[in-house]
Amino acid sequence: MDHIDAHSAVSTSSSSSKYDTPDDNISEQRLLCDAKEEYPLNDYLFDGINQESAQRSLLLCRQTFETSFGFALQSYVFKRTSSNSYERITYVDYVSADSPADRCGITRGDMVIAVNEKSVVTASHAEIVESIAQCLQVSLVLVFKDVARIVELSMRSIQLRFMLDAKIRELRMLEKTEEDLQALYDDEHGNEEEDESLESTLYELDEELKNVQNPQEKEANGTDYRHLIRINSSTSVGTPQVTRL
């Protein structure tokens, strides 16, 4: 096991409150620490993860409250379509280079399972942040599932669904216009110029319908739909909670 800076990670034998000071004389501490228990995972978000092998325990350490652990947490709430229920997840969204978090091996996408040996799977974003921020030494139990990528794909899925809905509405409008023009063409027996004009219009509509039926994946009118799935630590739509620690 690699050895690291004493102020980056130490063993999980103890955790400190805001009134404690890390031991500056500690040497050759281990990066990974033995978890004292396995914490239950959320079935919806943790499918495919081997619970026992995936969980890893780290102990982060800083000298003062003015210094940073070097990572940022972000919380989302995902909606389970099968049961129409909401499930929260808090994960590491950013890790500063050469920070205590970086030297400990914390990775963007790590999910926070427990803080100081207390499960936080159902805790709010504010509760998790408070439990970490009040410590000079904090033990974390993490599971990696690249949540950042999952969120990006979820955003893209939302965007594509809105684009598809917009194209379907456009298609229906064009089909209705085509039907009206076709009816007008069938009923009227005007001069050849009018007939040619109608035929030209119908041809243009056919071309538009082909384009609608094969839409390219691009942003609809420059609209950004990401906010639709960025929700806070409760269950309502709003601004995502991001906190640097």
Curated annotation (Swiss-Prot):
Protein name: General receptor for phosphoinositides 1-associated scaffold protein 1 homolog
Main localization (coarse): membrane
Cellular location(s): Cell membrane; Nucleus; Cytoplasm, Perinuclear region
Disruption phenotype: Normal brood size, with a slight increase in embryonic and larval lethality. Higher number of male progeny. Increase in germ cell apoptosis.
Domain called PDZ: residue spans: 57-132
Gene3D superfamilies per record: 2.30.42.10
Bias (Low complexity): 8-17
One Gene Ontology term from the biological process aspect of the record: meiotic cell cycle
Record keywords, A-Z: Cell membrane, Cytoplasm, Meiosis, Membrane, Nucleus, Phosphoprotein
One GO cellular component, as annotated: perinuclear region of cytoplasm
SUPFAM superfamilies noted in UniProt: PDZ domain-like
Function: Plays a role in early meiotic events; during prophase I contributes to normal meiotic progression, timely homologous chromosome pairing, synaptonemal complex assembly and meiotic DNA double-strand breaks repair. Effects on homologous chromosome pairing and synapsis are alpha-importin-independent. Limits early prophase I chromosome movement in a dhc-1/dynein-dependent manner.
Subunit structure: Interacts with syp-3.
Region of interest called C-terminal Ser/Thr cluster, as start-end residue ranges on this chain: 233-236
Post-translational modification: Phosphorylation at a C-terminal Ser/Thr cluster is required for limiting autosome, but not X chromosome, movement in early prophase I.
Organism superkingdom: Eukaryota
Membrane-topology descriptor: Peripheral membrane protein
Note: Shares partial functional conservation with human CYTIP in meiotic DNA double-strand break (DSB) repair.
SMART domains: PDZ (SM00228)
Gene source species: Caenorhabditis elegans
Chain intervals for the UniProt region annotation (Disordered): 1-25
Phosphoserine modified-residue sites: 233
Tissue-wise expression: Hermaphrodite and male germlines.
